[in-house]
Amino acid sequence: MSELKDCPLQFHDFKSVDHVKLCPRYTAVLSRSEDDGIGIEELDTLQLELETLLSSASRRLRVLEAETQILTDWQDKKGDRRFLKLGKEHELGTPIKHSKPKKQKLDGKGSHASGPGPGRPKSRIMQQKMQEYEFTDDPVDVPRIPKNDAPNRFWASVEPYCADITNDEIKVLEDLLKTPEDEADYYKIPPLGKHYSQRWAQEDLLEEQKDGARAALSGDKKKGILGPLAELDSKDVDSLLKKSESQHDQPEDGCPFGHLTQRLLQALVEENIISPVEDSPIPEISGKESGTDGASTSPRSQNKPFSAPHTKSLEVRIKEELISQGLLESDDRPADDSEDEVLAELRKRQAELKALSAHNRAKKQELLRLAKEEMNRQELRQRVRMADNEVMDAFRKIMAARQKKRTPTKKEKDQAWKALKERESILKLLDG
């Protein structure tokens, strides 16, 4: 029981923070579901409430660390009761008085003599104890309070957003408004390359050419057989491909003319000008004529498809003439482009990029205008601070004159009125 009474612990009563009263926003956020989330407008209030909880927790932590340190020191020095007694007197503020060794009274003149006697060893023991007490009587080390850097780090992170605008930042905004040199490259449409079937066919022929060249090196016989194929170049490959396409690219109806030429001829030919075959009489053909015609015609000539030269150039000329006469609308781009999904997506993204660039440019111009206005306000605020200093100087001079029990001079009064009027004019400019 005596040890419990001598315990230096204070047993602080920690008061918990009432979250409902002091942190209502924090309590409301905890009661929400995960899908609701936190709004941007709630962040400032949440920050203040979290700082309140942090300060309360750090305060309790410091008190607990102090109690732990006191308990540790008390356990280390628990065996020495006299030290505890001296420690209590030291805590109460009473000066520590060490008892002096009592001198042995001697009768007569020999009282001051330092002769051998039983009191001599006793004084030595007392002095040794006093030195021991003085050595061990150290004040209790005050626990070091942990440094709370959270507010300092917070304000250091916020400072760049609240600091004054400088000329370097204005220059950065002006540089951002300059049109980049490569902006036009983003709106260019690359030319349409070859179709994959043509490209693959050309690659196959080139591969065969390389294989033939390798095979030709192995023997003279193979070289004689594959020699013409090995000597082909890229131009010869293209000519071969065009030739094969022209051979296989025959219209279904066997007509060599283009669709526009056929449509034009169909529009010019009048309908029902030929009588039906059933009503028209069949002319009789003489034997000579039939014989000569039969001899002149052959099955091979009948199976040969009809061909006419310069059909493609005729198609192009007819189209140009119809466009010049206004009978046909000109297309800005080929008809195949409308079916090109890649080109349509590219044009769509380019339009979005152009709209986004215009929006960003407008916002940058607005930001530059606001920054320049804020620079002017900063200069006015600096002038207001200088005017405040002048007003305070004039006020101090007038107060010093009154303390010396003399009336302020006319110069001091005029200086004070001038500073006040100048300050009012600057404030009007700042408010306006």
Curated annotation (Swiss-Prot):
One of its GO terms (cellular component) is SAGA complex. GO terms for molecular function: transcription coactivator activity. One of its GO terms (biological process) is regulation of transcription by RNA polymerase II. It holds the Pfam family Ada3. Residues 293-305 have a biased composition (Polar residues). Its main location: nucleus. Keywords: Coiled coil, Nucleus, Transcription, Transcription regulation. It comes from Xenopus laevis (African clawed frog). Residues 90-124, 275-315 are annotated as: Disordered. The keyword Transit peptide does not apply. Residues 335-398 form a coiled coil. Functions as a component of the PCAF complex. The PCAF complex is capable of efficiently acetylating histones in a nucleosomal context. This is Transcriptional adapter 3-B. Belongs to the NGG1 family. It is found in: Nucleus.
